[in-house]
Amino acid sequence: MTETSLSSQCFPMSVLNNTIAEPLIFLLMGIPGLKATQYWISIPFCLLYVVAVSGNSMILFVVLCERSLHKPMYYFLSMLSATDLSLSLCTLSTTLGVFWFEAREINLNACIAQMFFLHGFTFMESGVLLAMAFDRFVAICYPLRYTTILTNARIAKIGMSMLIRNVAVMLPVMLFVKRLSFCSSMVLSHSYCYHVDLIQLSCTDNRINSILGLFALLSTTGFDCPCILLSYILIIRSVLSIASSEERRKAFNTCTSHISAVSIFYLPLISLSLVHRYGHSAPPFVHIIMANVFLLIPPVLNPIIYSVKIKQIQKAIIKVLIQKHSKSNHQLFLIRDKAIYE
């Protein structure tokens, strides 16, 4: 069956709305117009997934194992890595399944679950970046009170509040998606479930879904972005009041990693929104490739940025790798000696 026939296939309402006995089945298109080359396109995507998963896992492992990194800044960094890791994994199975194995079918419940985690972790990343901006604000503007303001208990509360916020804004969106009826095309144009993509297939009024989706966006990234901007205005004002140019440079350098992380999250998001709004003349595969790449840019680049920019992370990674290598060699020597004496 061709992509055109799939997208035009009609399904009776009695069958489509029988979600309890037999959940609705949607078909993931992958990259429209590039079906013949999807296998080769998947290779760089797979490499990006490997880099994202291994890089963020390394950051989490290093922060967990190295006691010198048990500080507020690195706790927030581990939150960012955990979010990036989760964001990568929640689309990995369907994306590579579509590209490699033609596994295009996904039922409505699985689709809703994937959307919940996909959009939830995206909003979570925005919240973590805001928390990291607050960390930099306190470190530069109130250095003497840094450890008393950002205690372990307060950091845990910040992380929990971001999690609760995301669940609170995403749960109504998903519940109203569950109430939709679908009566025409069952083909999703991405390689994963995307909220806007799904509600456009509905044959019932989806205005409430659109409003809830917009509210979720504005109450998370729409709130976080201005707050991050405000924090850096206050940081710049504080840094410029420092008399020594060397101290000013050091203060700005402590923010470069976070500014880079904010840029690689918000700039692709803004670019993707502009392309969707104004790039109607662009081929459909351009939109889909951009959407897939956007999901992988922050998880791939964030570990690299923090590993390169922050010397403490570099030293901790090298230390952990050396210890692991030494432990492996020691075990090999023990095995060899045991074999000799036996």
From Swiss-Prot:
Entry's localization field: Cell membrane
GO cellular component, one term: plasma membrane
UniProt-listed InterPro entries: GPCR_Rhodpsn, GPCR_Rhodpsn_7TM, Olfact_rcpt, OR51/52/56-like
Extracellular membrane side: 1-39, 90-113, 175-210, 273-287
Superkingdom as given in the UniProt entry: Eukaryota
Glycosylation sites: 17
Cysteine disulfide links: 111-203
GO MF term list: G protein-coupled receptor activity; olfactory receptor activity
Coiled-coil intervals: none
Family affiliation: Belongs to the G-protein coupled receptor 1 family.
Role: Odorant receptor.
Protein name, as recorded: Olfactory receptor 51F2
